[in-house]
Amino acid sequence: MHPAAEHSPLGKSSEYIATYSPEQLFPIPRTAKWAELGVTAQTLPWQGVDYWNCFELSWLLPSGKPVVAIGEFAIPADSPNIIESKSFKLYLNSLNQTVFASLDALQACLEKDLSAAAGKPVGVKVRTLAEVEAQGVVALPGQCIDALDVAISNYEQPQPELLRCDPARVVEETLHSHLLKSNCPVTGQPDWGSVVVEYKGRALDHASLLTYLISFRQHADFHEQCVERIYLDLKNLLQPEHLTVYARYVRRGGLDINPYRSTGAISPDNKRLVRQ
């Protein structure tokens, strides 16, 4: 477990405060988990973003009438901190009985508070239900590898040694799987995800990728660190010209988390999958 997470509200009984309370936000430094992976803030081998989508966003108009919407938050992958998810939920719940004179005022408040917690500017979009409904759900790009016949019996820790490639062949392809699962390092609750791997490099054995992803099944870590571990293990094996790993997790507590890590420019779509 991340030492800072022990002091977070995650896994503890909490009072749900209904008026504006930015002090609910609990930042967790990324540095400890980066150190486990052998990287620092100065040597990050990726660009990226963590998309958070909030489906329980509500506030009051000056008339007292409530409004509901969906919030989209983009936290830079090189920000000093992640924001612990239960504290994020408690903060958002604290807006429920808070009056905002305009949508711009709400958005400015969210940007200020979340950027302060993350340690870097956080992008905020507040979208109407009609906007999100019109967007619908999308399918992941590329080839799904989930139908491959694989055997595995060890799920406790990620096993990069399972990964195989053909160093004599260079390919460019996009693969995806819906079989990613890990556990919250504090509560042990399951985190269900889908993941896309897009790369140009040594030809990756598809069955080995699937068994590797399945090996995360009992691993305890936050969403962001799981994706960064996948990214580094693939980068070390494939020596790619470019590599992108993008996971979209099933929501819990009204929030879903979607980490994106890439060698190149950041241009991911923040669009819902069928399980989101």
UniProtKB/Swiss-Prot annotation:
Query: What are the subcellular locations of this protein?
Result: Cytoplasm
Tell me which GO cellular component terms the UniProt record holds.
cytoplasm
Q: Which UniProt keywords apply?
A: Cytoplasm, NADP, Oxidoreductase, Queuosine biosynthesis
Entry annotated with the keyword Zinc: no
What SUPFAM superfamilies does UniProt report for this protein, alphabetically?
Tetrahydrobiopterin biosynthesis enzymes-like
Q: List ligand-binding residues for substrate.
A: I83, E84, S85, H223, E224
Q: In which pathway does it act?
A: tRNA modification; tRNA-queuosine biosynthesis
| Residues holding NADPH | S85, K86, R252, G253
Give the source's domain of life in one word: Bacteria
Spell out the molecular function terms from Gene Ontology.
Answer: preQ1 synthase activity
Q: Can you supply a Gene Ontology BP term from the record? A: queuosine biosynthetic process
Q: Where is the active site?
A: C184, D191
EC number assigned by the record: 1.7.1.13
Q: Which reaction does it catalyse?
A: 7-aminomethyl-7-carbaguanine + 2 NADP(+) = 7-cyano-7-deazaguanine + 2 NADPH + 3 H(+)
HAMAP family attached here?
QueF_type2
Q: Which family does it belong to?
A: Belongs to the GTP cyclohydrolase I family. QueF type 2 subfamily.
Q: What this chain does, per the record?
A: Catalyzes the NADPH-dependent reduction of 7-cyano-7-deazaguanine (preQ0) to 7-aminomethyl-7-deazaguanine (preQ1).
Q: How does it assemble?
A: Homodimer.
Official protein name in the record: NADPH-dependent 7-cyano-7-deazaguanine reductase
